[in-house]
Amino acid sequence: MTSSLLAASLIIALGQSPESVSTEPAEPAASFIQTRLSFLAGDTDFDAPDATTRFHVALDARTAELASGLHAEAAVSVFINPVAVSGAILQDNASFFGLRYRPSSWAPDERLALTVFPVSATRLYMGHENPVAWARISSLTRTGNDGEPALELRLSRRRWDAFVAAKLPSLQNGATQELERRLMLLVGAGVNLSPALRLEAGAANLDLGPGSRPYISGREGDIYTRGVSGRVMWRHGVPVGANVDLALYEGDPTFFERFFAPDVYPGGFGAHVALEGSYVSQQLFDSDSTEWGAMRKQAAHAAALVTRLKWDRLRLHALAYYRTPSFMVLANPGFPLESTLYEQMESLAELSATVGADYFLQDWGLTPGFLVRVTAPATLKSLVPMPMWPRSNPLIVRGTTSYSYLPEGAERSPILTAKATARWDLGEVAGVLAELFYTRDPNQTTFANDDTGVAVVVWDSQDIVGGNLLFQVRF
C-alpha cells in the first residue's frame, strides 16, 4: 500500500456511470443547480508521517430547454490542496461545458452531446474497470504548463452509442525543447445485443512527437502510444451498484459521484459480470540497440474480470485483474525514461484478486462491508539500469511513478489486505465513508549502510495499518 492511494487519484466529478460507457450525466428535465462539497482525510500508514487532507468543491448547472430538444450544462470541479501552514493550490478536475440535443421522437436516454473540457480531460479514457483504465493523461514525461483541453462528440441511441474525442496536451518537443500542442484521438462504440448483453470497443492514438535523443530524421523517430480496449458485459435483474473500496478507484475522476448516488434495494436478485482487455503498443527508444537513437515497439497488456451480485440488501463483489509493468507506466514509460525495457529483464505482471461483501441496514441508512485482497506486485528482475547507478536488485513497480527495490536475489511475495468499510447515507444531502485496513506487505524495503558504508536494500516492516474518511454534502 502506498501513499498514492490518497493522491490526485481520488477525484470527484460528474461522469461515467458504472453501467455505461458514457461520460455524461442523464438528460435533465429542467434547469438545475447543485453544489457539492467533499472533505477527504486519510493515512495510508498510521506509523508513518504521510497523513493527507483534501477539499473538493463542485458546482453543476444545467439549463432548461434552450430550443426544441436543446439543453446546455456546465460543471466547475476544483480541488483545494493545502500547502504549508495556510497556503492552498487549486487543481482543476475536468471542469466542462457542453450542449445536449434530443429530438422529441427520441427516448429520454438518447441524445447527441458535444462537451468541451477547457483545462483537463481525465474523464476521457480507454478501458472500464479503473485499475486497467488508461489514456486518462497523455504523458507525465514531457507535460507542459498549459493543461490538456479536449473535445468530445457522443451519440447515444437506445441500442448503441458511439463517440469521438480529441485531447490537445501541451508537450515538450524532445528535439527543440519547445512546448507544442500534440493530438490524442479516442474513438469508441457500444452495442446492446440484448437487454442483458452488451459489447464495447475503443481505440486511442497519441503522437508524442520527437524524443529527447538524436535520431535519424523522419516520422519513425517519433514516440507514440496506440492501443485498443474491449469489453463484454452481462447484466440481470435489479441494479447492483459499485463496491465500496477507494483503493480500486485510483485515478477515477467519477468515483465519488457514483459512490454517493442513491442506491436502490427493491428486493430480488441482480447480477453484473464483465470481462475486458486492452492491448497497447508504444514506440520508444531501443535500450538494447547499439545504434544511438534507434526505436523499437513495446507492448503492454491488461485484463480484468468483475462480478457483482445483489440479493435483497446483501451485495457480493469480486474483481481480478492483470497488468504488465509496461502497462502500469504508460504515461511515464521506460527504464530509463522513454526507452524500452532491456531484453535481459524478466517482466512479471501484477496479479490481483479482491472479494468482499456489504449489507444495507435500511433503518440506519448504513452499509457496513468487509473485503480481502491478494496482490502479486509487478516486478522487473535481473539488471535494472538507472542513470549513473546500475543495480541488479529486483524492482517492484507499484504505480506510474512509484517503485521500490528488493534485496538482491529476493523474490516478490503476495501482498494481503483486509479492509472494513462503512457507508452512511444521511438523506439526500450528505454521505460519509470510512475505511480501516490492515496490509501485510513482505516486499517493504528501505536503504541502510552496510559495514563498508555503502547503501544497500534491506527489509522493512511488513505490517501497515491505515484508514480513510470521506464526508460529502450536497445542496
Q: For the regions a protein language model found, what residue spans apply to each?
A:
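Surface-exposed loop and membrane-interface regions of Gram-negative outer-membrane beta-barrel proteins
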Residues: 46-51, 65-109, 173-177
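Surface-exposed, well-ordered secondary-structure segments
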Residues: 88-103, 107-108, 130, 135-137, ...
